[in-house]
Every structure is written in C-alpha cells, then in structure tokens.
C-alpha cells in the first residue's frame, strides 16, 4: 500500500493554496465543498477565483509566497505554474511536517487527491497511487454509472434514525442485520423513487416487526476462482455473522467474507481429516438458534454432490428458515477453463455427472449407461478409484482409446490438466493433486486446441486471458 486512504475533516480548518489559475480553482472547489477556510496566495486570480474572492468565499493574499504562510494552516496545496515555486512550497511544508500536495508532481507530495464519487454523505475515493490516473478516472466513471444517486438520501435518512434503532435494538449484531435488510429491501426502493415519507414509514414498520431469529443461507462458492462467485453469493457472505466452509472453498473466496465474521472449517477430504456431516448439521442448527445469520459455504454448487439437500432437510426439521444460492459446479467451471466443452454437436449429445464416492450401502452404479458412446462422463471425487472406473467402463463397452482427462485445482492458477485415454486413466489420476475431476469422452480431444487458461493454455486458438482488463472498461470491448 503506497498511500494510506484517509478522510480528513476540513470543516472550518485553514487550507493554503499557492496559485491562482485553473488548476488551483479545481482544487479550491473541492476544498470549499468540504467546508475548508481557503487562503490563496497568488499575484493574480483567474475570473472564477476572483468571483469567489469578491463573495468572501476565499481569502486572497495578493503577494509573493513566504514561509510564514504555511505556519498556521492545516494543509497546503501548490498549484502554481512555477515548478520551482511549487517545489519550494513542498520543502518548507515538509520541514514543518505539514501535509502538502504539489499538483501533478507525485514526487513532491505527502498526500495525493483520489478520484471521487460523491453521494454525500457517502463518498468513494479511487486511487492508483499516482501510477495510472487515467485508469483511476475510468474506474470512477464506471462506479458513477453503477451507484444510484439515492445513496446519499438513504444515508441521510438512516442517520436520522440511528438513535431510534439503537434504542430498540440493543446489540451491534441486531442493528447491523436490521440495516442490511433495509438497504436491500423495500426501504431502499422507496428512497430510490424519491418517496421519502413512505421510506421513513417503512423503517418504523420494520423496526417494530424486526425478526430476531437466526437464518441459514446455503451458498455455492463455485469451483475456486473468486471471479466465478455469484453476486448473490458475495452479498450473502458479506452479511454473515458466521461462515461454515469446506475444504473446496478457495482462499480467494474466503478473503471476500466480511472481516468480523466468524469462520469455522467443517471440511473433509478423501485422504484427510473430516468433520462428520452430523456435526455440521448440528452446528448450523445451534448457531441459527442463537439468532445468528449463518452461511454454509460449499465448493461448487451445494446441490451437486455437496450434500446440500441433507443439510436443508435438517434445517427444515428444526424449523430454521433458510435460502439457497446456487454456484457454478466444478464440472462446468473446470472443463471450461480446460478448454473441454461438455457437449459438442460432433462428439457428445449429453453429459452425465456422477460421484466416485458413494455411501457404503448405495446400490451399484449402472455402468452400462455410463459406458455409452457420444456422451461426456464427468466423475467427481473419483481419483482414488480411477483404475476401477476405467476397468468397469471398458468391461461395459467403452473403448480403451476413449480420450480422458484429469483436471486438478480447476479454475485456480495452479490448475493442471492431464490428458490421455481410458486405458491409462489410473496413471493420470495417480499423480494428480486433489481436488481432481475426471472427464471421459471424445470432447477431451479438443483440449489441446481449445486450452486457454494457465500453463495448459497453449492451444492454437488461445485468445488472450481469462478476463479482459476490468471486463472491458468501455461498453462492448472484447478480447482481441
């Protein structure tokens, strides 16, 4: 972090600006908006600043800059056209340990100005630490388009209601949960539509009826890449009091969890320690009964070999309210990143997902169905049984020459895709790090041509990177 982001209270504080031209005027406009008492040292002022001086909105010191000018001010901005003067201002300010900014000269600044999105009292600052000001400006423009102007009104109304909410809801957790609900509900919609009176009535109603019970949200984290987490999933993990996560949730996803939320690992791996499912179920119920907002965060999609159905049955049995946020399952995400289409008009008219890890008393797999040609077979948690899988498929008619792949660490920077055939599937799986996904079918043969991501991305049709910069800052921009 090159610069520490901080918001300064300038209301009523003296600020010195050296320079009387258009550059100085732009900074002075911001300072006046913040309530600063602006002193301008310059021999001449442009028309805009002259008008401000005539209206007594700024104090004009029509003289040469002197060291005495900086001694009684809070911060200093050098914005003259004289580079030598600007640098002298910097040196004197530094010697007095006063914050100083020389406009457009980063080496002579103890602080810099960010790009600002103003939804007063909500303010958002964007900075590239002076490295790429145009990029920071483009980001600001993108955020300006995304953020409704009603945010400021929403914040002002909320400020008026803070004391009432605090009196009604005693704990910080209760108050946070209440406001999260309002900012994502009907109150926010009313404010956006300029219906202020109705919005305040809605707040009063919600405060009176505020539900204090717990809640569980079953959230699919996707296959690993944090960029594949859904927007709804992100909202849920940033509103959680506690997150129960498994071993397939990547560090990138966990870094998005609200910082003060409790995180509890409840994962399991085929070769390692495991948290019994019954313990996880009981923990969800207990935490919800304590009135906490719980997120059960599961790799991939919670309803695709994630035992999500079993967990919801437990919650329903104990009358715990819940919701489900789907995620991108590994079979979809990992194969896409490996350049292996699950279906293709020339090679596969169907795709079948199956688990390689079954309950001990589960009925036998229908191998005849899985061995059909012109379909893609994706096997979760099958690496340890790869030899048996290959043997059974061949026994039921699948050719030993059928292309096969083992994808490890799918969608993550460490992703590896090992390809071969059904005949040597066991060898491919033996050296593959977990978590690994097995893909069998003619579509695997397209990997070499379509691979685009990571160290395997050497296909002849590779077109750049996973994400064009910022998704294309300009509408319609695509990878070249």
Curated annotation (Swiss-Prot):
Instruction: Tell me which PANTHER family the record gives.
Output: SIROHEME SYNTHASE, SIROHEME SYNTHASE-RELATED
Amino acids binding NAD(+): 22-23, 43-44
Q: Which SUPFAM superfamilies match?
A: NAD(P)-binding Rossmann-fold domains, Siroheme synthase middle domains-like, Tetrapyrrole methylase
Tell me which UniProt keywords the record has, alphabetically.
Cobalamin biosynthesis, Lyase, Methyltransferase, Multifunctional enzyme, NAD, Oxidoreductase, Phosphoprotein, Porphyrin biosynthesis, S-adenosyl-L-methionine, Transferase
- Record-annotated active site: 246, 268
What GO biological process terms does the UniProt entry carry, in alphabetical order? Answer: cobalamin biosynthetic process; methylation; siroheme biosynthetic process
Question: Which residues are annotated with the PTM Phosphoserine?
Answer: 128
Q: What is its EC number?
A: 2.1.1.107, 1.3.1.76, 4.99.1.4
Keyword Phosphoprotein in record:
yes
Gene assigned in the entry: cysG
Name the record gives this protein: Siroheme synthase
Gene3D superfamilies the UniProt entry points to: Cobalt-precorrin-4 Transmethylase, Domain 1, Methyltransferase, Cobalt-precorrin-4 Transmethylase, Domain 2, NAD(P)-binding Rossmann-like Domain, Sirohaem synthase, dimerisation domain, Siroheme synthase, domain 2
Family (UniProt): In the N-terminal section; belongs to the precorrin-2 dehydrogenase / sirohydrochlorin ferrochelatase family.
């Amino acid at each position: 972090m090159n610069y520490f982001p901080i918001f300064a209270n300038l209301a009523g504080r003296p600020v010195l600006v050296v320079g009387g031209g258009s550059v100085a005027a732009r900074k002075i406009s911001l300072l006046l908006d913040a309530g600063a008492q602006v002193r301008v040292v310059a021999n001449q002022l442009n028309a805009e600043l002259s008008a401000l001086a005539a209206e007594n909105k700024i104090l004009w010191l029509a003289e040469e800059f002197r060291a005495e000018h900086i001694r009684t001010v809070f911060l200093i901005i050098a914005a003259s056209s004289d580079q030598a003067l600007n640098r002298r201002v910097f040196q004197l300010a530094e010697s007095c340990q006063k914050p100083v900014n020389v406009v457009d000269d980063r080496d002579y600044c103890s602080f810099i100005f960010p790009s600002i999105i103003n939804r007063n009292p909500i303010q958002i600052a964007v900075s590239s630490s002076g490295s790429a000001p145009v990029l920071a400006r483009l980001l600001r423009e993108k955020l300006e388009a995304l953020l409704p102007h009603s945010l400021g009104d929403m914040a002002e109304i909320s400020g008026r209601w803070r004391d009432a909410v605090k009196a009604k809801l005693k704990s910080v957790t209760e108050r946070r949960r209440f406001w999260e609900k309002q900012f994502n509900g009907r109150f926010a919609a009313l404010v956006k539509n300029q219906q202020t009176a109705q919005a305040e009535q809605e707040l009063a109603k919600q405060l009176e009826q505020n539900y204090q019970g717990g809640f569980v949200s079953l959230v699919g984290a996707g296959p690993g890449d944090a960029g594949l987490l859904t927007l709804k999933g992100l909202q849920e993990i940033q509103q959680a009091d506690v997150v129960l996560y498994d071993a397939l949730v990547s560090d990138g996803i966990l870094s998005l969890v609200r910082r003060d939320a409790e995180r509890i690992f409840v994962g399991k791996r085929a070769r390692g320690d495991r948290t019994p499912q019954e313990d996880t179920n009981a923990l969800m119920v207990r935490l919800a009964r304590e009135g906490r907002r719980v997120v059960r965060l599961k790799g991939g999609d919670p309803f695709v070999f994630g035992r999500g159905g079993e967990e919801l049955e437990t919650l329903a049995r104990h009358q715990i309210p819940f919701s489900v946020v789907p995620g991108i399952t590994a079979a979809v995400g990992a194969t896409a990143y490996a350049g292996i289409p699950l279906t293709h008009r020339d090679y596969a008219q169907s795709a079948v997902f199956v688990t390689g890890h079954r309950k001990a008393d589960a009925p036998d797999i229908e191998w005849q169905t899985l061995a059909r040609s012109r379909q893609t077979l994706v096997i979760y948690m099958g690496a340890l049984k790869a030899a048996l899988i290959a043997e059974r498929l061949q026994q039921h008619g699948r050719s030993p020459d059928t292309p096969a792949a083992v994808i490890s660490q799918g969608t993550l920077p460490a992703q590896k895709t090992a390809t071969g055939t059904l005949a040597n599937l066991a060898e491919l799986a033996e050296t593959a790090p977990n978590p690994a996904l097995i893909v069998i079918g003619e579509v695997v043969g397209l990997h070499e041509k379509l691979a685009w991501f990571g160290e395997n991305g050497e296909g002849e049709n590779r077109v750049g990177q996973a994400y064009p910069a910022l998704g294309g800052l300009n509408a319609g921009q695509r990878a070249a």
